[in-house]
Regions:
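Charged, flexible boundary elements
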Residues: 8-13
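Aspartic protease
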Residues: 14-99
């Protein structure tokens, strides 16, 4: 799809069998989701943003569905005010910025 930027670029995603809304954030390296249970093992990670550093759980090889695309990606789970789709996932679905 082509998304204008007059409002926040939000997309519905399906992760861990749950449907969530997330912000497409080209400034974010990683995909970060609000607290949720995901299957499999995780490892601790620290990520930094405008608000400083936060501890998150890194889950690898998580199936995600976004805009009709199915991908397997790394997902970080932790305290975030907004679910964020980062460049790690957007590159997999062929997302580009065009001017």
């Amino acid at each position: 799809p082509q998304i204008t930027l007059w409002q926040r670029p939000l997309a519905k995603i399906k992760v861990g069998g749950q449907i969530k809304e997330a912000l497409l954030d080209t400034g974010a390296d990683d995909t970060v989701l609000e607290e949720m249970d995901l299957p499999g093992r995780w490892k601790p990670k620290m990520i930094g943003g405008i608000g400083g550093f936060v501890k998150v759980r890194q889950y690898d090889q998580i199936p995600i569905e976004i805009c009709g695309h199915k991908v397997i990606s790394t997902v970080l789970v932790g305290p975030t005010p907004q679910n964020i789709i980062g460049r790690n996932l957007m590159t997999q679905i062929g997302c580009t910025l065009n001017f």
